[in-house]
Amino acid sequence: MGINNPIPRSLKSETKKAAKILASFVKPNQVFGADQVIPPDVLKRAKGLAIITILKAGFLFSGRAGSGVIVARLKDGTWSAPSAIAMAGAGAGGMVGIELTDFVFILNTQDAVKSFSEFGTITLGGNVSVSAGPLGRSAEAAASASAGGVAAVFAYSKSKGLFAGVSVEGSAIIERREANRKFYGDNCTAKMILSGRIRPPPAVDPLFRVLESRAFNYRPSNGGRGSFDDDEDDYYDDDDYYNDIPSSFSSTDASSTRPNTRSTRRRAQSGSRYTFDDDDDDDDYGTGYSRNSRLAPTNSGGSGGKLDDPSGASSYYASHRRSGTAQSRARSSRNRWADDEYDDYDDDYESGYRRGNGRDRTKDREVDDLSNRFSKSRISSASTPQTSQGRFTAPTSPSTSSPKAVALYSFAGEESGDLPFRKGDVITILKKSDSQNDWWTGRVNGREGIFPANYVELV
């Protein structure tokens, strides 16, 4: 086992370290067989993970300190972005020595995740119970059968040092708020990260390649009741079962910088192997820009579109800071939306007219509808001032020609006036701006409201 650094570093470095540690705990190798790794059923049920490297030293008194990351499983089955954490603790007794330990803590309950996200700290053995986690397939049935009475946290560890035992009772896991703010943005909190409100940037891709492997999405044919037949034994012991977990996470690994959108990762899970859709090169945010400028940074202060922070998270988070009421945001984008709508009408009308007799019947109906709308608008607003381009400044009411968008993933809404929707819903766009780093107004399922534009894709 290699030696990992317990000293707190940047969140990008901590995430890469966490990916290496987690892979060593869930993927069998020449030293640890399939019966000496965390069972897939335990990983499947996990509500969250904390991965930490701890240095323990003592002479009469002992102290523990280390750093790592914590992630939470969201309601849709995906994982939150990682939050930087640190661990600290102390003990007493005749202990002499030094020890370096890698820990993986499986958070089995939503309360354990909520306790950390709400208060930024949990105390192992204090406000959450902790016990040694089961190992291998032989322990998986017992863990499944007693799932209702397990400890809130399972602890797994690998040590290198002189201490005979490993104990984390009384240790506190705390949020490294400054590291989170430096990586994600000034006002970012652990609660926002673990609730899924912060999108994972490409810089944390190594960890997600492990989290979205088959080992974390194991589905036995018996429905997870804990008994295994011969076919399931063969499948579990199959060498290909863990092939989607990388063996290394070097910086030269080309796949470690692949785009990392939620939709890409969810599509990857449906295949027999963990692959990325090369056609979808949208960056959630970061050093790369998407082809359709879905998450391109807003141009302010002559920045030239370049990001100052390595992950790009600060620009992303700043562009989504909500200011004012929902009504003021809607008013701010109304005029821009009106111009865009008339631009679309002009383009559609002219292109349809030029096609002449070659138009199909559907296009004829659309052009006629647009023509009638223009005629009515000109009659009813003859005294309305026009811009230099001849466009009206007052928008017409939305019609069947309003743009549509498909939800890339679910949005529960944060305030009154927000438009909640589920992944896959088709949303009618009522008001929009030129940028998807903005809040648009739409309608779905009979409701109207505003929503973050980068949650959807125009169709």
UniProtKB/Swiss-Prot annotation:
The modification Phosphothreonine is found at T298, T393. Keywords: Cytoplasm, Phosphoprotein, SH3 domain. PROSITE patterns: SH3. Residues 351-371 have a biased composition (Basic and acidic residues). GO terms for biological process: actin cortical patch localization; actin filament bundle assembly. InterPro entries: SH3-like_dom_sf (IPR036028), SH3_domain (IPR001452), SH3_domain_YSC84-like (IPR051702), SYLF_SH3YL1-like (IPR033643), Ysc84_actin-binding (IPR007461). It comes from the Eukaryota. Residues 229-242, 340-350 have a biased composition (Acidic residues). Phosphorylation of Ser-397 is induced 2-fold in response to mating pheromone. Residues 219-403 are annotated as: Disordered. Interacts with LAS17. PANTHER family: SH3 DOMAIN-CONTAINING YSC84-LIKE PROTEIN 1, SH3YL1 PROTEIN. Belongs to the SH3YL1 family. This is LAS seventeen-binding protein 3. It comes from Saccharomyces cerevisiae (strain ATCC 204508 / S288c). The gene is LSB3.
